Structure formats: C-alpha cells, structure tokens
Amino acid sequence: MLRVSFEQLLEAGVHFGHLKRKWNPAMAPYIFMERKGIHIIDLHKTILKIDEASSAIKQIIRSGRKILFVATKKQAKQVVADKVSFVGMPYVTEHWAGGMLTNFPTIRKAIQKMTVIDRMAHDGTFDLLSKRERLQITRQRAKLEKNLGSIADLKRLPSALFVVDVMKERIAVSEAKRLDIPVFAIVDTNSNPNGIDFIIPANDDATSSIEVILNAICDAIIEGKEERMMDTSINNENKEKTVSVFRKRTKIEGRSKKDSLS
C-alpha cells in the first residue's frame, strides 16, 4: 500500500487544526502543540491512523464489499468525486438525503425510478410523451441524479462509511452508527471523534489535505480489488484441479469395477 510520508502531509497542510478556542477536548491525544492560537496536529499519529484505516479498507474491498464516501463540503466535493469514482466506489457529494441508510428500501425505489426513466429514453417510450411530460420527467431525473446518481449501483447497504468532516456529516454518521456500519473519518481538532471507528486526525478544510489522505485510501482500495481478483483466480484454479482429480478418480474406479467383473 501507498505509505504517506511526514513530508507529504506537512506540505499538504494536514497538520493545521482549528483555533484553540474552537477545539474539542476529545481530540487532545492527536494535538502536538499550539502555535499562534492554532492547534497543530501530530502528523506521526496521522500516519499511523492512515495506515490503520488503509489496512482495514483493503480487507473490506478484498471481501467484495462496498464503502460509501460522504463529503458535501465545498473543499472536498470535487476531489472526492474524482478519486472515488476512479476506484469504483459510491459517493455522496451534493446532499445527504435523510434516511439514505436507515430508510434504504425507499432510496432503492428512487434509484429504480431513475432506471425506469433511463429505460424509457432508450426504448422510445419517452418520445411518445407530450412535451410537458418529457420536461417534468427530465427535471425529475436531473434531481434524482444530483442527489443519488453516484449510488445508483449500490444494491445493498454499504459495509462502511468514509466521511470528510464528521461535524458537517453528522446525520450520515448517526445513521451509520444506528445500523452498526463502521465509520472511517477525517477528523479535525474542532470535531468529536467519539463513536468514529477509524479516526484520521487531519485538516478537513484544505483540499490538499483531503487529497493526500484520499490518495492513500484509494490506493488501498485498488490493492484490495487486485487481491480479490487473485483470490478468485486461485479459487477457480483450485476448483478446476479438484474437478480434474475427481474425474480421474472416477475413471480409475470405473476401470477397477470393470476389471473385477471380467
């Protein structure tokens, strides 16, 4: 896996926390010092936490499960969409619809509605509608795409959540906890880390900070997928060997029976 260096984190500004007066005391173990009224995050601990999170994420992906990324703040939207779509994971960057996890069956219905509209556009049904009906459906499709487009392929609840800024995404975190879904999160010095399963202490306001962490996480996802492919290949090879041995044994036993009868 890609191991982020101290220098990379420093250059990306990962160490910059919030003003001392805005801090959450629960983040004290991850604070190195205070400089000019601003808390400085201990990057050695950040590296350890990135490694821990990366290892856990790789195992989740290796087992064939999905991780849902949530980042609706301006500084994180684009970088998360770019990085996460590249590795084929679902993400929410526009708006967290309440009940997206706790009321997942309803969300699935909305996704299915998108699928129906897309099918109408492809099979010609759309052309049979009036101009007004087409406009209404097009607007409806655009709204669904904005809110749910990136999770359209999510057939079941995700196995984990990765969150940028636990304060802003508190509803998503709350829903995940209610369903016992593990939460990975970039947590700044003004946030409460309690209840977060995998804490990555870091600046969650700078795009450069978010990006350098996502690079490591996405690399772990790629490795997890590669190892899953290898596991599948080995399993298929073992199955073929087992079938081959079984067939040979069956032939030998068949010959033995014929010999004993003759």
Curated annotation (Swiss-Prot):
Protein name per Swiss-Prot or TrEMBL: Small ribosomal subunit protein uS2
Gene: rpsB
Origin species: Azobacteroides pseudotrichonymphae genomovar. CFP2
Gene3D superfamilies tied to this protein: Glucose-6-phosphate isomerase like protein, domain 1, Helix hairpin bin
Record keywords: Ribonucleoprotein, Ribosomal protein
Coiled coil: none
UniProt keyword Ribosomal protein present: yes
A Pfam family this chain is assigned to: Ribosomal_S2
One GO CC annotation: cytosolic small ribosomal subunit
SUPFAM superfamilies in UniProt: Ribosomal protein S2 (SSF52313)
GO molecular-function terms, A-Z: structural constituent of ribosome
GO aspect biological process, one term: translation
Keyword Ribonucleoprotein: yes
Family: Belongs to the universal ribosomal protein uS2 family.
